Regions:
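Alpha-helical scaffold domains
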Residues: 1-215
Length: 215
């Protein structure tokens, strides 16, 4: 029997729900008005991912439980793939991805899997793959392969474009010299978004921000 979460115990829900729903108009689920931080805390107390889905927070909770469970990547992959249709909002992809537990012995297998997953026809699943790569696999050795996947994307999905822009800005923060060449190769709108994210970031030096004008 699915677990029904009582979100009513959390304070200030109405205000938070309105705010979340403005940020996630694409979600078919209304917000319960509970922060992602609180959802993550709750996920640590529940092992069963059979959650009754009534609110966006229920979706986040289910995904975080699946992602954070300590098990082999082969086991986790099956459960993740069953969850992919529930990536109905950027908040779902971006909340689940950072919590993903991958055993050290499975890192290479997982990396190859998510590299391939960037090609998924569903834009939200593809976004999830890019966010996972950004958070778990971005190194000086992997950046070229990851960015080559990014420049290959042709999409009308604003949320996928924004996800790739976020990835690109993260690459530029950590590896500006290696990332610079990719701005001109990206979809024009993605490149524009990525540059703006870099300009807005306090982690990009003034010199690196100036360099963006020539990219």
């Amino acid at each position: 029997m699915a677990i029904k979460i009582d979100w009513s115990i959390y304070p200030d829900r109405e205000r938070k729900a309105k705010f979340t729903q403005k940020l996630t108009p694409e979600s078919p689920y209304k917000s319960a008005g509970v922060s992602v931080i609180e959802v993550k805390k709750l996920a640590k107390t529940i092992n069963d991912d059979d959650i009754e889905l009534n609110y966006l927070e229920d979706v986040l909770l289910k995904g975080i439980i699946i992602a954070s469970r300590k098990e082999s990547f082969a086991e986790k992959r099956k459960k993740l793939e069953a969850f992919y249709p529930l990536f109905i909002s950027w908040m779902a992809t971006d909340s689940v991805a950072p919590t993903l537990y991958i055993p050290k012995k499975d890192k290479k297998e997982a990396y190859r899997y998510f590299i391939k997953l960037t090609e998924d026809k569903d834009p939200m699943t593809s976004r999830f793959a890019f966010v996972v790569l950004m958070g778990h696999f971005l190194t000086e050795e992997s950046i070229d392969e990851i960015m080559n996947k990014a420049i290959a994307i042709k999409t009308d999905s604003y949320l996928l474009k924004m996800g790739i822009a976020w990835l690109t800005s993260s690459c530029y923060i950590h590896y500006p010299e290696k990332t610079s060449k990719y701005f001109s190769l990206l979809d024009k709108e993605i490149s524009k978004m990525a540059k703006q994210k870099c300009r807005d970031s306090k982690r990009v030096s003034p010199e690196a921000k100036k360099s963006l004008h020539n990219l």
